[in-house]
Amino acid sequence: MTRKYFGTDGIRGQANSFPMTPEVAMKVGMAVGHIFRRKGQTSRVVIGKDTRRSGYMLENALVAGFTAAGMDVFLLGPIPTPAVAMLCRSLRADIGVMISASHNPFYDNGIKLFGPDGFKLSDEIELKIEAMIDGDLTPYLASHGDVGRAKRVDGDIYRYIEFAKRTLPRNIDLNGLRIVVDCANGAGYKVAPAALWELGAEVITINNEPNGININEDCGSTHPIGLMKKVHEVRADVGIALDGDADRVLLVDENGTVIDGDQLMAVIAESWAASDRLEGGGIVATVMSNLGLERFLADRHLTLARTKVGDRYVVEHMREHGFNVGGEQSGHIVLSDYATTGDGLISALQILAVAQEQGKPISEICRKFDPVPQLLKNVRTSGGKPLENKRVKSAIDEATERLGVQGRLVIRPSGTEPLIRVMAEGDDRGLVEKVVNDIIDVISSEGSAAA
Protein backbone atom coordinates (compact mmCIF):
# COMPACT_ATOMS: atom_id res chain seq x y z
CA MET A 1 0.00 0.00 0.00
CA THR A 2 1.32 3.44 -0.96
CA ARG A 3 2.26 5.66 1.95
CA LYS A 4 1.35 9.33 2.03
CA TYR A 5 3.05 10.45 5.23
CA PHE A 6 5.44 7.84 6.62
CA GLY A 7 8.80 7.01 5.11
CA THR A 8 11.41 4.56 6.38
CA ASP A 9 12.06 6.70 9.48
CA GLY A 10 8.79 8.34 10.45
CA ILE A 11 7.32 11.43 8.83
CA ARG A 12 9.83 13.89 7.41
CA GLY A 13 9.93 17.01 5.25
CA GLN A 14 10.63 20.73 5.15
CA ALA A 15 9.25 22.53 8.18
CA ASN A 16 5.99 24.37 7.50
CA SER A 17 5.53 22.52 4.22
CA PHE A 18 3.41 19.39 3.80
CA PRO A 19 3.62 17.04 5.60
CA MET A 20 5.66 18.89 8.26
CA THR A 21 2.92 21.37 9.13
CA PRO A 22 1.35 22.11 12.53
CA GLU A 23 -1.96 20.80 11.18
CA VAL A 24 -0.53 17.40 10.26
CA ALA A 25 1.45 17.22 13.52
CA MET A 26 -1.69 17.89 15.56
CA LYS A 27 -3.59 15.21 13.63
CA VAL A 28 -0.72 12.78 14.24
CA GLY A 29 -1.09 13.47 17.96
CA MET A 30 -4.83 12.92 17.84
CA ALA A 31 -4.58 9.69 15.85
CA VAL A 32 -1.67 8.19 17.77
CA GLY A 33 -3.18 9.30 21.06
CA HIS A 34 -6.42 7.50 20.27
CA ILE A 35 -4.63 4.29 19.24
CA PHE A 36 -2.37 4.10 22.29
CA ARG A 37 -4.60 5.59 24.97
CA ARG A 38 -5.60 3.05 27.61
CA LYS A 39 -9.30 3.34 28.32
CA GLY A 40 -10.13 4.14 31.91
CA GLN A 41 -6.49 4.70 32.86
CA THR A 42 -4.06 7.59 32.77
CA SER A 43 -2.05 7.37 29.56
CA ARG A 44 1.11 9.28 28.84
CA VAL A 45 3.37 10.21 25.96
CA VAL A 46 6.97 11.41 26.16
CA ILE A 47 8.11 13.93 23.56
CA GLY A 48 11.73 14.82 22.84
CA LYS A 49 13.26 16.96 20.13
CA ASP A 50 16.55 18.01 18.65
CA THR A 51 17.67 21.63 18.40
CA ARG A 52 15.90 22.81 15.22
CA ARG A 53 13.96 26.04 15.45
CA SER A 54 10.86 24.36 14.05
CA GLY A 55 10.88 21.90 16.93
CA TYR A 56 8.94 24.37 19.08
CA MET A 57 6.19 24.65 16.48
CA LEU A 58 5.79 20.92 15.99
CA GLU A 59 6.08 20.20 19.71
CA ASN A 60 3.15 22.48 20.52
CA ALA A 61 1.06 21.04 17.71
CA LEU A 62 1.72 17.50 18.93
CA VAL A 63 0.84 18.52 22.50
CA ALA A 64 -2.49 19.88 21.26
CA GLY A 65 -3.22 16.64 19.44
CA PHE A 66 -2.24 14.26 22.23
CA THR A 67 -4.02 16.18 24.98
CA ALA A 68 -7.14 16.43 22.79
CA ALA A 69 -7.02 12.64 22.54
CA GLY A 70 -6.88 12.40 26.33
CA MET A 71 -3.19 11.67 26.91
CA ASP A 72 -0.87 13.37 29.39
CA VAL A 73 2.31 14.71 27.82
CA PHE A 74 5.82 14.79 29.30
CA LEU A 75 8.05 17.23 27.42
CA LEU A 76 11.71 16.19 27.60
CA GLY A 77 13.24 19.08 25.64
CA PRO A 78 16.38 18.60 23.52
CA ILE A 79 17.46 14.99 23.97
CA PRO A 80 18.86 12.21 21.73
CA THR A 81 16.51 9.92 19.84
CA PRO A 82 17.75 6.80 21.71
CA ALA A 83 17.07 8.58 25.00
CA VAL A 84 13.42 9.02 24.01
CA ALA A 85 13.17 5.31 23.22
CA MET A 86 14.84 4.43 26.54
CA LEU A 87 12.72 6.85 28.59
CA CYS A 88 9.57 5.58 26.93
CA ARG A 89 10.25 2.28 28.67
CA SER A 90 11.71 3.75 31.87
CA LEU A 91 8.78 6.13 32.43
CA ARG A 92 6.27 3.46 31.36
CA ALA A 93 4.86 5.71 28.70
CA ASP A 94 2.36 4.44 26.17
CA ILE A 95 4.07 6.15 23.25
CA GLY A 96 7.29 8.07 22.60
CA VAL A 97 7.82 10.83 20.05
CA MET A 98 11.05 12.32 18.73
CA ILE A 99 10.90 15.53 16.71
CA SER A 100 13.95 15.40 14.46
CA ALA A 101 15.16 15.07 10.89
CA SER A 102 18.35 13.36 12.05
CA HIS A 103 21.33 14.39 9.87
CA ASN A 104 19.29 16.65 7.56
CA PRO A 105 19.70 20.47 7.45
CA PHE A 106 17.87 22.66 9.96
CA TYR A 107 15.02 23.53 7.60
CA ASP A 108 13.85 19.91 7.58
CA ASN A 109 12.15 18.21 10.48
CA GLY A 110 10.44 14.95 11.26
CA ILE A 111 8.32 12.94 13.67
CA LYS A 112 9.53 9.53 14.85
CA LEU A 113 7.25 7.32 16.91
CA PHE A 114 8.14 4.61 19.43
CA GLY A 115 5.83 2.09 21.03
CA PRO A 116 5.80 1.39 24.78
CA ASP A 117 8.56 -1.19 24.22
CA GLY A 118 10.86 1.49 22.77
CA PHE A 119 10.76 0.07 19.24
CA LYS A 120 9.56 1.94 16.18
CA LEU A 121 5.99 1.26 15.15
CA SER A 122 5.01 -1.48 12.74
CA ASP A 123 3.95 -0.82 9.16
CA GLU A 124 0.40 -1.82 10.06
CA ILE A 125 0.09 0.78 12.81
CA GLU A 126 1.65 3.48 10.61
CA LEU A 127 -0.89 2.75 7.87
CA LYS A 128 -3.69 2.93 10.43
CA ILE A 129 -2.40 6.33 11.57
CA GLU A 130 -2.30 7.56 7.98
CA ALA A 131 -5.91 6.51 7.40
CA MET A 132 -7.02 8.32 10.56
CA ILE A 133 -5.13 11.51 9.66
CA ASP A 134 -7.01 11.73 6.37
CA GLY A 135 -10.36 11.02 8.00
CA ASP A 136 -12.59 12.76 10.52
CA LEU A 137 -10.83 12.70 13.88
CA THR A 138 -13.68 14.29 15.84
CA PRO A 139 -15.12 10.96 17.07
CA TYR A 140 -11.75 10.05 18.58
CA LEU A 141 -11.34 13.11 20.78
CA ALA A 142 -11.58 12.81 24.55
CA SER A 143 -14.53 14.22 26.44
CA HIS A 144 -14.12 17.64 28.02
CA GLY A 145 -13.38 16.04 31.38
CA ASP A 146 -10.74 13.69 29.99
CA VAL A 147 -8.55 16.15 28.10
CA GLY A 148 -4.90 15.50 28.91
CA ARG A 149 -2.33 17.72 30.60
CA ALA A 150 1.21 18.63 29.56
CA LYS A 151 4.28 19.46 31.59
CA ARG A 152 7.98 19.92 31.04
CA VAL A 153 10.07 17.46 33.02
CA ASP A 154 13.56 18.17 34.32
CA GLY A 155 16.17 15.61 35.20
CA ASP A 156 15.23 12.81 32.85
CA ILE A 157 18.21 13.66 30.69
CA TYR A 158 20.36 12.48 33.62
CA ARG A 159 18.55 9.15 33.67
CA TYR A 160 19.81 8.61 30.16
CA ILE A 161 23.35 9.72 31.03
CA GLU A 162 23.47 7.20 33.88
CA PHE A 163 21.99 4.53 31.63
CA ALA A 164 24.64 5.14 28.95
CA LYS A 165 27.46 5.11 31.51
CA ARG A 166 26.33 1.73 32.84
CA THR A 167 26.92 0.14 29.42
CA LEU A 168 30.67 0.51 30.02
CA PRO A 169 32.01 -2.54 31.92
CA ARG A 170 32.39 -1.74 35.62
CA ASN A 171 36.11 -2.51 35.62
CA ILE A 172 36.80 0.00 32.83
CA ASP A 173 36.90 3.79 32.92
CA LEU A 174 38.09 6.47 30.51
CA ASN A 175 40.86 7.89 32.68
CA GLY A 176 43.80 9.08 30.62
CA LEU A 177 41.85 9.55 27.39
CA ARG A 178 41.64 12.91 25.68
CA ILE A 179 38.44 12.92 23.63
CA VAL A 180 37.09 15.50 21.21
CA VAL A 181 33.31 15.34 20.81
CA ASP A 182 31.51 16.92 17.86
CA CYS A 183 27.90 17.30 18.97
CA ALA A 184 26.67 18.56 15.56
CA ASN A 185 24.94 21.41 17.43
CA GLY A 186 22.26 18.83 18.00
CA ALA A 187 20.42 16.78 20.58
CA GLY A 188 23.54 15.23 22.12
CA TYR A 189 25.18 18.53 23.05
CA LYS A 190 24.59 18.03 26.78
CA VAL A 191 24.56 14.28 27.32
CA ALA A 192 27.63 13.13 25.39
CA PRO A 193 30.22 15.47 26.97
CA ALA A 194 28.73 14.90 30.43
CA ALA A 195 28.78 11.10 30.20
CA LEU A 196 32.35 10.98 28.90
CA TRP A 197 33.61 13.42 31.54
CA GLU A 198 31.88 11.52 34.35
CA LEU A 199 33.61 8.34 33.15
CA GLY A 200 37.00 10.01 33.59
CA ALA A 201 37.92 11.35 30.15
CA GLU A 202 39.36 14.75 29.37
CA VAL A 203 36.66 16.11 27.09
CA ILE A 204 37.04 18.81 24.46
CA THR A 205 33.72 19.70 22.89
CA ILE A 206 33.05 21.34 19.53
CA ASN A 207 29.79 22.31 17.83
CA ASN A 208 27.89 22.30 21.10
CA GLU A 209 26.22 25.72 20.84
CA PRO A 210 22.94 25.13 19.00
CA ASN A 211 21.04 28.21 17.87
CA GLY A 212 18.16 26.58 16.01
CA ILE A 213 19.68 26.80 12.54
CA ASN A 214 23.23 25.44 12.86
CA ILE A 215 22.37 21.78 13.50
CA ASN A 216 24.48 19.54 11.20
CA GLU A 217 25.89 22.64 9.48
CA ASP A 218 29.39 21.61 8.33
CA CYS A 219 29.73 19.48 11.44
CA GLY A 220 28.83 16.16 12.99
CA SER A 221 29.02 12.69 11.50
CA THR A 222 28.20 13.87 7.97
CA HIS A 223 30.94 16.53 7.98
CA PRO A 224 33.86 15.26 10.10
CA ILE A 225 36.52 17.59 8.64
CA GLY A 226 36.38 19.96 11.62
CA LEU A 227 36.68 17.07 14.05
CA MET A 228 39.66 15.65 12.17
CA LYS A 229 41.43 19.00 12.45
CA LYS A 230 40.61 19.40 16.13
CA VAL A 231 41.84 15.91 17.02
CA HIS A 232 45.15 16.72 15.32
CA GLU A 233 45.35 20.19 16.88
CA VAL A 234 44.89 19.06 20.50
CA ARG A 235 46.59 15.68 20.02
CA ALA A 236 43.52 13.82 21.18
CA ASP A 237 43.32 10.06 21.49
CA VAL A 238 40.01 9.92 19.65
CA GLY A 239 37.27 12.05 18.17
CA ILE A 240 33.57 11.22 18.37
CA ALA A 241 31.15 12.65 15.79
CA LEU A 242 27.41 12.47 16.42
CA ASP A 243 24.62 13.53 14.09
CA GLY A 244 21.75 15.90 14.85
CA ASP A 245 19.73 13.48 16.96
CA ALA A 246 22.74 11.46 18.22
CA ASP A 247 21.54 8.10 16.92
CA ARG A 248 24.58 7.64 14.69
CA VAL A 249 28.31 7.98 15.30
CA LEU A 250 31.62 8.00 13.47
CA LEU A 251 35.04 8.06 15.13
CA VAL A 252 38.28 9.79 14.21
CA ASP A 253 41.48 8.09 15.36
CA GLU A 254 44.52 9.81 16.85
CA ASN A 255 45.95 10.29 13.35
CA GLY A 256 42.87 12.13 12.11
CA THR A 257 41.50 9.22 10.07
CA VAL A 258 37.72 8.74 9.92
CA ILE A 259 36.38 5.35 11.06
CA ASP A 260 32.99 4.46 9.61
CA GLY A 261 30.20 2.27 10.88
CA ASP A 262 31.47 -0.84 9.11
CA GLN A 263 34.78 -0.74 10.98
CA LEU A 264 33.01 -0.01 14.27
CA MET A 265 30.69 -2.97 13.82
CA ALA A 266 33.70 -5.18 13.07
CA VAL A 267 35.32 -4.15 16.37
CA ILE A 268 32.18 -4.84 18.38
CA ALA A 269 31.45 -8.12 16.61
CA GLU A 270 34.96 -9.47 17.19
CA SER A 271 35.04 -8.33 20.82
CA TRP A 272 31.59 -9.65 21.68
CA ALA A 273 32.22 -12.96 19.89
CA ALA A 274 35.41 -13.45 21.89
CA SER A 275 33.49 -12.97 25.14
CA ASP A 276 30.52 -15.12 24.01
CA ARG A 277 28.21 -12.12 23.98
CA LEU A 278 27.48 -12.08 20.25
CA GLU A 279 24.11 -13.59 19.39
CA GLY A 280 22.84 -14.90 16.07
CA GLY A 281 26.24 -16.06 14.87
CA GLY A 282 27.10 -12.70 13.32
CA ILE A 283 25.67 -9.24 12.73
CA VAL A 284 23.07 -7.48 10.59
CA ALA A 285 23.93 -4.68 8.16
CA THR A 286 22.46 -3.21 4.97
CA VAL A 287 23.28 -3.80 1.33
CA MET A 288 25.54 -0.73 1.49
CA SER A 289 28.05 -2.20 3.96
CA ASN A 290 31.44 -2.92 2.46
CA LEU A 291 32.35 -6.36 1.14
CA GLY A 292 35.49 -6.12 3.27
CA LEU A 293 33.32 -6.33 6.40
CA GLU A 294 31.64 -9.47 5.10
CA ARG A 295 35.01 -11.10 4.39
CA PHE A 296 36.38 -10.08 7.80
CA LEU A 297 33.44 -11.73 9.54
CA ALA A 298 33.57 -14.84 7.36
CA ASP A 299 37.24 -15.34 8.28
CA ARG A 300 36.06 -15.54 11.89
CA HIS A 301 33.17 -17.88 11.06
CA LEU A 302 30.64 -15.11 11.59
CA THR A 303 27.82 -14.19 9.22
CA LEU A 304 26.72 -10.87 7.78
CA ALA A 305 22.97 -10.72 7.18
CA ARG A 306 22.04 -7.90 4.80
CA THR A 307 18.83 -5.86 4.67
CA LYS A 308 17.44 -2.94 2.73
CA VAL A 309 18.83 0.50 3.59
CA GLY A 310 17.33 1.89 6.78
CA ASP A 311 17.95 1.10 10.43
CA ARG A 312 14.33 0.00 10.89
CA TYR A 313 14.98 -2.93 8.54
CA VAL A 314 18.16 -3.78 10.42
CA VAL A 315 16.26 -3.82 13.72
CA GLU A 316 13.42 -5.88 12.25
CA HIS A 317 15.88 -8.53 11.06
CA MET A 318 17.70 -8.53 14.39
CA ARG A 319 14.47 -9.11 16.29
CA GLU A 320 13.19 -11.79 13.93
CA HIS A 321 16.42 -13.80 13.78
CA GLY A 322 18.02 -13.34 17.20
CA PHE A 323 20.93 -10.98 16.48
CA ASN A 324 22.10 -8.41 19.04
CA VAL A 325 24.46 -6.32 16.87
CA GLY A 326 23.49 -4.52 13.69
CA GLY A 327 23.90 -1.25 11.90
CA GLU A 328 24.78 0.80 8.87
CA GLN A 329 27.97 2.06 7.29
CA SER A 330 26.74 5.58 8.06
CA GLY A 331 27.12 4.96 11.79
CA HIS A 332 23.68 3.81 12.90
CA ILE A 333 24.68 0.99 15.23
CA VAL A 334 22.06 -0.94 17.16
CA LEU A 335 23.15 -2.93 20.21
CA SER A 336 19.97 -4.60 21.38
CA ASP A 337 21.49 -5.66 24.70
CA TYR A 338 21.18 -1.98 25.58
CA ALA A 339 19.00 -0.12 23.11
CA THR A 340 16.07 -0.49 20.74
CA THR A 341 17.43 1.90 18.15
CA GLY A 342 20.74 3.34 16.98
CA ASP A 343 22.67 5.02 19.81
CA GLY A 344 25.77 7.05 18.98
CA LEU A 345 27.01 7.50 22.55
CA ILE A 346 26.57 3.89 23.65
CA SER A 347 28.19 2.61 20.44
CA ALA A 348 31.19 4.88 20.98
CA LEU A 349 31.52 3.67 24.57
CA GLN A 350 31.77 0.04 23.42
CA ILE A 351 34.70 0.94 21.15
CA LEU A 352 36.41 2.91 23.92
CA ALA A 353 35.96 -0.07 26.25
CA VAL A 354 37.85 -2.32 23.82
CA ALA A 355 40.64 0.25 23.45
CA GLN A 356 41.01 0.69 27.21
CA GLU A 357 40.86 -3.03 27.88
CA GLN A 358 43.55 -3.81 25.30
CA GLY A 359 45.65 -0.71 25.98
CA LYS A 360 45.95 0.04 22.27
CA PRO A 361 45.39 3.24 20.25
CA ILE A 362 42.14 3.69 18.35
CA SER A 363 43.95 3.45 15.00
CA GLU A 364 45.07 -0.06 15.85
CA ILE A 365 41.78 -1.14 17.39
CA CYS A 366 39.55 0.10 14.59
CA ARG A 367 41.41 -0.88 11.43
CA LYS A 368 39.98 -4.37 11.22
CA PHE A 369 39.90 -4.77 7.45
CA ASP A 370 40.89 -3.01 4.25
CA PRO A 371 37.71 -1.79 2.58
CA VAL A 372 37.08 -3.09 -0.91
CA PRO A 373 37.03 -0.23 -3.46
CA GLN A 374 33.47 1.07 -3.44
CA LEU A 375 31.84 3.80 -5.52
CA LEU A 376 28.40 5.33 -5.05
CA LYS A 377 26.89 7.80 -7.51
CA ASN A 378 23.44 9.30 -7.88
CA VAL A 379 21.63 10.06 -11.11
CA ARG A 380 18.60 12.35 -11.16
CA THR A 381 15.53 11.07 -12.96
CA SER A 382 12.43 12.76 -14.35
CA GLY A 383 10.01 10.24 -12.93
CA GLY A 384 8.72 7.00 -14.33
CA LYS A 385 10.39 3.65 -13.67
CA PRO A 386 13.86 3.84 -15.24
CA LEU A 387 14.97 0.54 -13.69
CA GLU A 388 12.34 -1.27 -15.79
CA ASN A 389 13.79 0.11 -19.04
CA LYS A 390 15.21 -2.64 -21.30
CA ARG A 391 18.53 -0.90 -21.99
CA VAL A 392 18.99 -0.11 -18.30
CA LYS A 393 18.23 -3.72 -17.35
CA SER A 394 20.71 -4.94 -19.94
CA ALA A 395 23.42 -2.59 -18.64
CA ILE A 396 22.81 -3.79 -15.08
CA ASP A 397 22.99 -7.46 -16.12
CA GLU A 398 26.23 -6.84 -18.01
CA ALA A 399 27.78 -4.98 -15.06
CA THR A 400 26.80 -7.76 -12.66
CA GLU A 401 28.43 -10.35 -14.89
CA ARG A 402 31.62 -8.30 -15.22
CA LEU A 403 31.95 -7.82 -11.46
CA GLY A 404 31.47 -11.55 -10.91
CA VAL A 405 31.68 -13.21 -7.53
CA GLN A 406 34.42 -10.82 -6.35
CA GLY A 407 32.18 -7.77 -6.52
CA ARG A 408 28.71 -6.43 -5.78
CA LEU A 409 26.28 -4.10 -7.50
CA VAL A 410 23.47 -2.32 -5.64
CA ILE A 411 21.01 -0.11 -7.51
CA ARG A 412 18.06 1.43 -5.74
CA PRO A 413 15.78 4.46 -6.00
CA SER A 414 16.09 7.08 -3.28
CA GLY A 415 13.26 7.09 -0.80
CA THR A 416 13.22 10.88 -0.52
CA GLU A 417 14.38 12.35 -3.84
CA PRO A 418 13.95 11.63 -7.59
CA LEU A 419 17.30 9.86 -7.70
CA ILE A 420 18.65 6.45 -8.59
CA ARG A 421 21.59 5.41 -6.42
CA VAL A 422 24.19 3.23 -8.14
CA MET A 423 26.80 1.51 -5.96
CA ALA A 424 29.42 -1.00 -7.02
CA GLU A 425 32.35 -2.53 -5.21
CA GLY A 426 35.05 -5.01 -6.05
CA ASP A 427 38.77 -5.67 -5.90
CA ASP A 428 39.38 -3.95 -9.27
CA ARG A 429 38.91 -0.21 -8.68
CA GLY A 430 39.02 0.60 -12.38
CA LEU A 431 36.30 -1.91 -13.17
CA VAL A 432 34.14 -0.60 -10.32
CA GLU A 433 34.37 2.95 -11.67
CA LYS A 434 33.60 1.81 -15.22
CA VAL A 435 30.48 -0.22 -14.41
CA VAL A 436 29.04 2.59 -12.27
CA ASN A 437 29.68 5.22 -14.93
CA ASP A 438 28.29 2.98 -17.68
CA ILE A 439 25.04 2.43 -15.78
CA ILE A 440 24.75 6.12 -14.93
CA ASP A 441 25.20 7.01 -18.61
CA VAL A 442 22.50 4.57 -19.75
CA ILE A 443 19.99 5.75 -17.12
CA SER A 444 20.68 9.37 -18.05
CA SER A 445 20.38 8.81 -21.80
CA GLU A 446 17.22 6.74 -21.51
CA GLY A 447 15.69 9.33 -19.22
CA SER A 448 16.44 12.07 -21.73
CA ALA A 449 15.00 9.98 -24.57
CA ALA A 450 11.82 9.33 -22.61
CA ALA A 451 11.42 13.04 -21.89
From Swiss-Prot:
Keywords: Isomerase, Magnesium, Metal-binding, Phosphoprotein. SUPFAM superfamilies: Phosphoglucomutase, C-terminal domain (SSF55957), Phosphoglucomutase, first 3 domains (SSF53738). The active site is at 102 (phosphoserine intermediate). It catalyses: alpha-D-glucosamine 1-phosphate = D-glucosamine 6-phosphate. The modification Phosphoserine is found at residue 102. Pfam families: PGM_PMM_I, PGM_PMM_II, PGM_PMM_III, PGM_PMM_IV. Mg(2+) binds at residues 102, 243, 245, 247. One of its GO terms (biological process) is carbohydrate metabolic process. PANTHER family: PHOSPHOGLUCOMUTASE (ALPHA-D-GLUCOSE-1,6-BISPHOSPHATE-DEPENDENT), PHOSPHOHEXOSE MUTASE. This is Phosphoglucosamine mutase.
